[in-house]
């Protein structure tokens, strides 16, 4: 069993919603709920190339060196769409909040003087081998975070929580994607944008 495998979507698609729920409940209770460290320096053991200790902090769902939180939470949101199970949504709301805070803390990258957010892709989907990982903003990871903030706002309204922070973040992400990643001359989004240097797409 690996978190984030696409097969976990199939239970709902086949009408076997209990299987998807069972899969999610194998992982969601394991989410890291430890206090958030004040600071975490880059990992010397990998020549400061990444920060594995930071990855495994409050909100993380697995000890993997990938960001498999992202597809797992996507599976959770789509399960809620399939089932309309608001009791399960209420039960898992803290996990959703911790996940979104974890994504913001680790992977949110500010662009422009107004610091609009794109999100770094930290091996966050299984089609990862030919995608960019350089600390900048990537379209697929940013699109996931846009959708998840939209869904969090939608769920929040239905379970009596405040949707405003998630609506605001979704709005900022969409503005960032349109301004920083859209290639008007080609009619599609760039795959990524550098954070440093010339900030090329």
List each language-model region with its residue ranges.
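Catalytic cores of carbohydrate-active enzymes
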Residues: 38, 107-120, 134-140, 144-201
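A short, charged helix-loop
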Residues: 124-130
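Aromatic-rich carbohydrate-recognition surfaces in CAZymes
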Residues: 1-115, 138-146
């Amino acid at each position: 069993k690996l978190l984030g495998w696409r097969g976990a979507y199939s239970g709902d698609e086949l009408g076997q919603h209990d299987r998807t729920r069972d899969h999610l409940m194998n992982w969601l209770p394991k989410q890291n709920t430890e206090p958030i460290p004040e600071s975490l320096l880059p990992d010397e053991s990998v020549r400061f190339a990444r920060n594995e200790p930071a990855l495994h902090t409050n909100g993380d769902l697995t000890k993997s060196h990938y960001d498999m939180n992202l597809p797992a939470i996507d599976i959770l949101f789509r399960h809620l769409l399939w089932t309309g199970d608001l009791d399960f949504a209420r039960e898992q709301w803290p996990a959703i909040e911790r996940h979104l805070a974890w994504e913001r803390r680790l992977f949110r990258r500010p662009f422009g003087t107004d610091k609009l957010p794109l999100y770094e892709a930290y091996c966050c989907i299984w089609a990862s081998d030919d995608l960019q990982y350089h600390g900048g903003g990537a379209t697929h990871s940013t699109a996931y975070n846009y959708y998840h903030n939209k869904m969090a706002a939608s769920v929040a309204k239905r379970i009596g929580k405040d949707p405003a922070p998630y609506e605001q973040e979704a709005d900022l992400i969409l503005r960032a994607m349109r301004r920083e990643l859209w290639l008007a001359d080609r009619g599609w989004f760039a795959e990524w944008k550098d954070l440093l240097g010339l900030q090329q797409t």
